[in-house]
């Protein structure tokens, strides 16, 4: 009898413990159903919306403390087909009245048309010049995720079988312009896991409208990086409520809080001008070239520029290795860990048995910073401009867990580095030397591309190493009618520092004689 009582008590405890979870699940479904009814989500199969606004180019701010470099979104059209799990996005960007400072192709020359598509697990771009598909297998997962980060997509995904949404309620106050509001609103937060790993949170207000959708996405520099959309100015079209304004943050919107090491956060704002509901058109067909595409392997092509100096190309971003008596220095650790581990392997092949003691980081743009953590884990001291010190030390070179795409530094953190060996900063000039060879590092003053830009110079070999300032065009390309401001600025710095340059080893493009650079900027002679 005692045993039966114990079993009954145990079963009662299990049922009692399970009851709140069941109630919570039912509450989550009730909130979702109310939102779906209010928004007309159940009748929405597809939507096409057009508008204008601006784009913030993520990871390309001029100063690390600035917001993302901004360009005008002259036109934007997106069609989402929720049943097909597909989307087509076409936009035209131009420089507009935005300051021509920062990366990502700034200053934009004329209008640039961009076309991006996703269908289920396939992603591709379309080249506007010939309308041929360009496979983007590395972008497929995040583009698929993005289908569910808008209000209707969120509701559909959260209500899908197996989503297992949970509900929490909280009071929130928000920012009003630059001021923090003290008005608190009670809001419902629905949370579920998308694509097996992305925690997606939707904020539903007292009108049963989804006003915010937030998740984290992997980034080589930031790790688990905030991605969120805020939705306002709702309108009713054929019984479907749809936001008239989209505002997206990529990275945390913490501009009112100090310290703020990275100012970038506003990545997209546009106002909807036209909206078509359930006018789905023809289904998107996945091209054969896209279906068979795979992520290409990393290739590193090594070219000897001089004794102990190696150009490490083979992709869109390059590095340069310089051999010293008992160590090696590498200029640039770009893109991501995958690229840089291949670079490290290539360095040890041509310069064996010497550790990589330094990595020179040209600037803070994410495509040139993404592999710094891998070099740091390898044991290299990072040399960068002093402007970047706090951001790198506090937010980049950390051992914090990375849950979405763990890297070596987060998985296998090294013993704490001695003070001073994590970062070495440059103000105007720094030098890496073993007493017989110098690698001089200079601050590029007045660069329109990035504040804190560095370039490297080998005085004995007369080789200049630079990133994003001068990207040599093809040998048969026509010279620009007006030289780009960044290239002119490079020449000004070469003259100011009295550098005797014979060869430029750019970190994009190809190695060129200095005379070719002079021709590019409309000068002749030496």
Regions found by a protein language model. Give the residues of each.
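Conserved beta-strand hairpin/beta-sheet module of binuclear metal-dependent hydrolase folds
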Residues: 303-349, 453-472
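Flexible, processing/modification-adjacent segments and terminal tails
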Residues: 24-33, 103-113, 117-200, 206, ...
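Zn-dependent metallo-beta-lactamase
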Residues: 262-325
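Divalent-metal (often Zn2+) His-rich catalytic cores of metallo-beta-lactamase-fold enzymes
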Residues: 491-526
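Active-site metal-binding motif and surrounding structural segment of the metallo-beta-lactamase
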Residues: 338-383, 425, 496-502
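Bacterial N-terminal signal peptides
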Residues: 8-18
């Amino acid at each position: 009898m005692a045993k039966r009582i114990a079993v009954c008590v145990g079963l009662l405890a299990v049922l009692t413990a399970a009851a709140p979870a069941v109630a919570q699940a039912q509450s989550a479904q009730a909130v979702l159903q109310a939102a779906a009814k209010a928004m007309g989500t159940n009748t929405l199969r597809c939507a096409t919306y057009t508008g204008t606004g601006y784009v913030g180019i993520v990871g390309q701010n001029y100063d690390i403390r600035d917001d993302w470099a901004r360009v005008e979104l002259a036109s934007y059209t997106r069609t989402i087909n929720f049943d097909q799990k597909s989307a087509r996005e076409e936009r035209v960007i131009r420089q507009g009245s935005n300051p021509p400072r920062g990366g990502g192709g700034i200053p934009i020359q004329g209008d640039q048309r961009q076309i991006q598509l996703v269908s289920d697990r396939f992603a591709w771009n379309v080249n506007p010049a010939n309308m041929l598909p360009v496979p983007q297998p590395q972008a497929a997962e995040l583009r698929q995720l993005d289908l569910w980060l808008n209000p209707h997509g969120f509701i559909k995904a959260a209500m899908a079988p197996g989503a297992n949404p949970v509900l929490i309620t909280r009071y929130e106050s928000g920012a009003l312009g630059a001021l923090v509001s003290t008005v608190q609103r009670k809001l419902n937060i629905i949370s579920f896991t998308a694509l097996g790993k992305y925690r997606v949170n939707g904020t539903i207000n007292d009108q049963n409208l989804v006003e915010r959708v937030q998740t984290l996405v992997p980034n080589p520099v930031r790790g688990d990086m905030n991605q969120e959309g805020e939705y306002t100015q709702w309108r009713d079209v054929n019984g479907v409520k749809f936001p008239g304004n989209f505002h997206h943050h990529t990275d945390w919107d913490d501009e009112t809080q100090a310290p703020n090491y990275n100012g970038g956060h506003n990545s997209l704002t546009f106002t909807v001008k036209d909206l078509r509901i359930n006018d789905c058109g023809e289904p998107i067909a996945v091209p054969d070239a896209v279906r068979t595409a795979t992520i290409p392997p990393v290739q590193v092509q090594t070219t000897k520029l001089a004794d102990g100096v190696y150009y490490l190309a083979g992709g869109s971003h390059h590095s340069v290795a310089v051999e010293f008596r008992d160590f090696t220095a590498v200029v640039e650790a770009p893109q991501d860990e995958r690229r840089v581990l291949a670079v490290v392997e290539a360095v040890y092949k041509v310069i064996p048995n010497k550790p990589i003691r330094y990595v020179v980081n040209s600037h803070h743009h994410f495509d040139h910073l993404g592999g710094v953590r891998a070099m740091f884990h390898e044991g290299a001291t990072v040399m960068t401009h002093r402007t970047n010190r706090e951001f790198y030390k506090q937010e980049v070179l950390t051992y914090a867990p990375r849950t979405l795409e763990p890297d070596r530094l987060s998985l296998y953190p090294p013993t704490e580095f001695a003070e001073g060996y994590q970062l070495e900063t440059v103000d105007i000039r720094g030098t890496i030397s073993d007493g017989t060879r110098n690698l001089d590092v200079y601050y590029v003053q007045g660069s329109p591309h990035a504040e804190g830009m560095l370039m490297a110079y080998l005085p004995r070999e007369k080789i200049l190493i630079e990133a994003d300032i001068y990207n040599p065009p093809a040998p048969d390309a026509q010279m620009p009618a007006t030289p780009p401001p960044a290239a002119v600025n490079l020449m000004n710095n070469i003259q100011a520092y009295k550098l005797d340059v014979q060869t430029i080893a750019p970190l994009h493009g190809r190695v060129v004689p200095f005379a070719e650079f002079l021709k590019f900027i409309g000068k002749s002679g030496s």
